[in-house]
Each structure stands twice: as structure tokens, then as C-alpha cells.
Amino acid sequence: MRVLVVEDELLIRYAIAETLGLAGHTVIEADNGAAAVRALTNSAEAVDVVMLDYRLPDSNDLTLLAAIRRLSPQSGVILMTAHGTPEVRHGALDLGAYEVMHKPFELHDLEPLLLKAFAASGPSQSTPHTPAGWRP
């Protein structure tokens, strides 16, 4: 499974990426919203699941989640937050996030949640996609 981890805290991003990599997943890392958008638009293969931090240096609302859902509608999205409120949770779910995961969390909880998000994300998982603007 291809997983995009969008997290500005280096140690958290590293721990998630390492855990998922050891579980056999291909992990793409981004430390801000712009890097996440680039990763989604420049990737030759579809991203199956996006693990997205709610508060990033260049995005601290649900705008980035909406952009990710437009760019990669086949990807399951798990929103990670240490500042979760019921409004954030409902807004994220309304925009198509699979789940809102509250920090801190246990790394061993990632794999089952990732698999559920992957299973719920739709039929076009793990298939190549066409980057925006590309024409044969």
C-alpha cells in the first residue's frame, strides 16, 4: 500500500513512516501542505491512504483536506490532530476523511486503522493515476 504521511513534526513523521515501512508499506513523506500537494500531483502511482496532520505550517484548517480529496478522491484520508474538537471531527468526516486520530496515539494502532481506511477508500486503489494536466 502507498501511504502519504503529511506531518511537520520530524520525529512524529519519522516514527509513523518507519512503522509503516517496516509493515511493508511504501511511504511518501511531506512536511507541509504544499509538499503534500506536489507529492499527489507528481506521483506516477496513486496514493492509497493519506495520513494528514491537521495543523501544518502552511495549513491549519480543513482546506488542505478538501484539496487532497479533490486531487486524489480514491485515497483514504486519516486526519491526525492534537487539537481535535467535535467541530474539527465533523468537518473532516463531512469532507471525506475516513477517521480523525487524536495525538498522541500508539504506533501499533496505525496498521489496523490504515487497513480499514484502505478498504473503505474505493475501487481504484493501488492503480496508477494520471497527474493533473498530463496528456498522451
Placement of each model-derived feature along the sequence:
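Short amphipathic alpha-helix used as the core "switch/output" element in two-component signaling
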Residues: 38, 62-74
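Acidic catalytic/metal-coordinating carboxylates
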Residues: 32, 60-63
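Conserved acidic carboxylate
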Residues: 7
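C-terminal output helix
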Residues: 87, 105-115
